[in-house]
């Protein structure tokens, strides 16, 4: 288990810097510490509490074997969110949100199967027999699908939760999740409505350092849950093997 995130870590990463006071959403009032130089400052003690609550809930989801979809299409979040999702072998959408990715998942699955078929076809000898134009068309189509859907290529069923950076930018993804009853975990800045998500984490959603530290904190929680799940499965397998051996030994004695 990695070092637990502390108040100073959040402070050093600028997690407390909100938006200009004139851009605030009054529903964020419970999470705001003060106003300074026309900017709202977020109460980092509240951020820590919310982060703990989010990780505890995510832990339960991940230990059940379900997936968490990472969603972050804003430029400064794409790299770190993609890297963390890949590290955890979790699905992600960081290029753009394809409308219906959740609410029309059956159609999305068809596109994923098409992408998989194209990949197999391009490795086949038959691909080289196509003329140059046909190969180019096929390659471009696959590339286009991969750009949008590559991050969810291994998603065989709807995710059990989504983790979002910037609720204003990802409002379509959040609306789709809410419609399907999928819990939403999100970094929420002072210009946003925290009530539209299930687990808001009040924080600066614009600065790279802030996005990084919180995404990695969420990622660490998920990693811990995955390790616990593996341990539980290994223990169950060991117990099963022991019971089987006992039964076998008993049968031999008889």
Swiss-Prot record:
Residues 226-254 have a biased composition (Basic and acidic residues). Keywords: Ribonucleoprotein, Ribosomal protein. PROSITE patterns: RIBOSOMAL_S2_2. GO terms for molecular function: structural constituent of ribosome. InterPro entries: Ribosomal_uS2, Ribosomal_uS2_bac/mit/plastid, Ribosomal_uS2_CS, Ribosomal_uS2_flav_dom_sf. One of its GO terms (cellular component) is cytosolic small ribosomal subunit. One of its GO terms (biological process) is translation. It comes from the Bacteria. Pfam families: Ribosomal_S2. Residues 225-254 are annotated as: Disordered. PANTHER family: 30S RIBOSOMAL PROTEIN S2 PROKARYOTIC AND ORGANELLAR, SMALL RIBOSOMAL SUBUNIT PROTEIN US2M. Belongs to the universal ribosomal protein uS2 family. This is Small ribosomal subunit protein uS2. It comes from Cytophaga hutchinsonii (strain ATCC 33406 / DSM 1761 / CIP 103989 / NBRC 15051 / NCIMB 9469 / D465). The lineage of its organism: Bacteria, Pseudomonadati, Bacteroidota, Cytophagia, Cytophagales.
């Amino acid at each position: 288990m990695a070092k637990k995130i502390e108040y100073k870590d959040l402070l050093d990463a600028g997690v407390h810097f909100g938006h200009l006071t004139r851009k605030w959403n009054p529903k964020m009032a419970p999470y705001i510490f003060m106003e300074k130089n026309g900017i709202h400052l977020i109460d980092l003690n509240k951020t820590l509490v919310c982060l703990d609550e989010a990780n505890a809930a995510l832990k339960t989801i991940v230990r059940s074997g379900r997936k968490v979809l990472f969603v972050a299409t804003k430029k400064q979040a794409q790299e770190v969110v993609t890297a963390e999702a890949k590290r955890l072998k979790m699905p992600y959408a960081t290029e753009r949100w394809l409308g219906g990715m959740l609410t029309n998942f059956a159609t999305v699955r068809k596109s994923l199967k098409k992408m998989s078929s194209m990949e197999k076809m391009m490795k086949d000898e038959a691909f080289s027999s196509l003329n140059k134009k046909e190969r180019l068309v096929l390659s471009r189509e696959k590339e286009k699908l991969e750009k949008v859907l590559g991050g969810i290529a291994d998603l065989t069923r709807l995710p059990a939760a989504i983790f979002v950076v910037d609720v204003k930018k990802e409002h379509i993804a959040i609306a789709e999740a809410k419609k399907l009853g999928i819990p939403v975990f999100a970094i929420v800045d002072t210009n946003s409505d925290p009530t539209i998500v299930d687990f808001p984490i009040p924080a600066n959603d614009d600065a790279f350092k802030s996005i990084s530290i919180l995404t990695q904190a969420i990622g660490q929680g998920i990693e811990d849950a995955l390790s616990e799940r593996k341990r539980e499965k290994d223990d169950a397998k060991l117990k099963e093997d022991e019971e089987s051996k006992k039964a076998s030994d008993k049968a031999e004695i008889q």
